[in-house]
């Protein structure tokens, strides 16, 4: 895996004895790879908007509040035949990637969705409420600490790798 200014390149190699051969390569444009997992012939790539590329990680203004429009991505590939690796699912959640854990077949991903200022307008609610897969999270999945001076959310998601169709659960 190589990260550079505009993209991340993922390379899959075959190793037999002293011979190493590149069998597959693909690029994630405007992404920065944060973490990789390999489990049961599935490659999980966790990435975020490229730090050097501001076209995706810009500041949006919603009245008197500014949100950092950063996104964490979870891309799942079938690598059972490495030379024919193919993406089987791509998921996303608001915020910059912070950490993840893989346990008992589930991937848990944590990101930080930051808001600066006070958000009082409902006109731009999608700008400051966390989202998963491009959809604003439901109210019953969000808890806000009232006295939090930072105005931020920790966005938490879980994916069952046996059925990676969608998130198993979400919360903020």
Q: Model-found features: residue ranges?
A:
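Beta-sheet-rich non-transmembrane sensory/scaffold domains
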Residues: 1-172
